[in-house]
Amino acid sequence: ASSDTAKKNSGGKMALQQIFYGAPGTGKSYEVNSITKKNRYATIRTTFHPDSDYSTFVGAYKPTMANAPVYGAQGVEIAKEKRITYTFVKQAFLKAYLGAWQKLANGVDSVEPQFLVIEEINRGNCAQIFGDLFQLLDRSGNGFSTYPIEADADLQNEIAKEFGQGGEYMLANEFNVDYAVPDYISNYGKTLTEDIKLGRILLLPNNLYIWATMNTSDQSLF
């Protein structure tokens, strides 16, 4: 498999973003898998298809069954029963995004990489799937996204919850990444670090690697 490198990482050893392309059976997925497994890199994988969209790539609220309280006439909880509630379900991109920031924030001597591997990237409508996330793929020399973007309300709330106290991806209190975008001006009067922690903006960290495979013989291309 050959590769199309979009941007080298700041260390110059691995490309932050690249596409492995070729005919079927030429070892595209094998090459990606051998690199990530050999080095024991944290990896989240997804496969694009014609029905893929932003919600299946990033996340969205979905109905789930959960125990909900049942209240009596006096307003006192008397029992619990299964009811349909709506929960934000994280998908591949958001899991990788949260994992990368956690590794960057909590790394002491070194920062572990986080990989997001997209199989068959050409089988999905990338404009529909990525949306404004495309802007984040433009990386600066330091490996961070050049242009932070605003997160929508649902995504903002989920990120703030996960990065906050008790969250699955809780960030270290002393974490500071203001250096990532030197000319950053917040729309909220805050620092870059604060806006990232609160989920107000999205910014790819320099340890998030997005690698994809593309089948050049596939006829269902977008």
Language-model segment annotations:
Residues 1-222:
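AAA+ P-loop NTPase catalytic core and its hallmark functional loops
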